[in-house]
């Protein structure tokens, strides 16, 4: 009986998601990265450029292992030659500036557009290639347990607005086309916080493809009494293999970064996430 319920729910999911999955294309912002800075002076801007460099190298290559590569830190010494344009977004937009000190300390998101040819050359010097082909479209099926409340994270659900924003931000950081199903399509799917059985994972993979996606990312994220942060498990279902990884005692922002970081690493051919 439960199998029939699951199959009906997955069929509904495919029908409802189909129009939301457009054709895969290279990410428009592939050579952009963001950093948090205070003020708009040149010193902080250089610091923001240096913060952004590892992120754009990871984003373009798909290899998160570059983040801690000491050779990337050495490249940061010439980061201003790699950066093209940049733009600030005031995190306190709409709030008045109180004084001159407030001007220096005002928080901004600095978005840096790097020069594609120079970033590609930098990657080749690090033994990597740019991952510029159309990237697989990912449909995310995520069960959330927040203390006493369990729910599917859906693109239109009452719960999880901040989590949806965090997932979108993480997907942008790693250059991945990601979408959530509508709540009506997954309402009848049984919630589970254990690693799903192989048959269930295959059903999700089939539903993702029927919905116009390329791969399914199944996850379970929980916060309960006694935890000091979120616990998250992820399974990326590809044609050849299902990859599993986990993260513990983190913010949900970091849990989503773990999901997107691992997905990018796998799909770009850089191995199994830890």
Model region roles, listed by residue range:
Residues 49-73, 136, 140-198:
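N-terminal segment of the mature soluble domain
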Residues 81-95, 140-142, 180, 196-227:
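A short, hydrophobic beta-strand-centered structural micro-motif
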Residues 30-78, 82-94:
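N-terminal Sec/ER secretory leader and immediately downstream segment
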Residues 69-142:
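Signal peptide-directed extracytoplasmic domains
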Residues 31-34, 38, 111, 116-118, ...:
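Amphipathic beta-strand/beta-sheet edge segments enriched in Tyr/Trp
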Residues 20-26:
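Bacterial Sec-dependent signal peptides at the C-terminal "C-region" and cleavage site
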Residues 47-62, 111-114, 119, 123-133, ...:
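C-terminal/domain-edge helix-coil "capping" segments
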């Amino acid at each position: 009986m439960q199998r029939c319920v699951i199959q009906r729910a997955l069929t509904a999911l495919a029908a409802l998601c189909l129009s939301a999955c457009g054709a895969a294309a290279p990410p428009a912002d592939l050579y952009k990265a963001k950093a948090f800075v205070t003020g708009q002076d040149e010193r902080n801007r250089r610091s923001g450029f240096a913060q952004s460099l590892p992120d754009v190298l990871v984003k373009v290559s798909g290899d998160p292992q570059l983040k801690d590569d000491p050779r990337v830190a050495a490249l940061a010494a010439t980061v201003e030659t790699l950066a093209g344009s940049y733009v600030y977004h005031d995190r306190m937009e709409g709030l008045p500036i109180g004084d001159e000190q407030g001007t220096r300390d005002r928080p901004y998101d600095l978005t840096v557009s790097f020069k594609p040819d120079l970033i590609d050359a930098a990657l080749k010097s690090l033994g990597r290639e740019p991952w510029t082909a159309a990237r697989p479209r990912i449909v995310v099926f995520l069960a959330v347990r927040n203390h006493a409340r369990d729910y599917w994270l859906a693109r239109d659900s009452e719960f999880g607005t901040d989590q949806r924003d965090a997932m979108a931000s993480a997907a942008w950081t790693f250059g991945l086309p990601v979408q959530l199903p509508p709540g009506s399509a997954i309402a009848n799917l049984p919630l589970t916080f254990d690693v799903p059985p192989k048959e269930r994972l295959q059903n999700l993979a089939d539903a993702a493809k029927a919905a116009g996606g390329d791969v399914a990312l199944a996850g379970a994220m929980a916060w309960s009494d006694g935890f000091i942060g979120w616990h998250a498990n992820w399974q990326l279902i590809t044609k050849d293999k299902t990859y599993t990884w986990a993260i513990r005692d983190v913010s949900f922002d970091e849990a989503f970064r773990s999901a997107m970081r691992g997905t990018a690493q796998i799909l770009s051919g850089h191995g199994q996430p830890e």
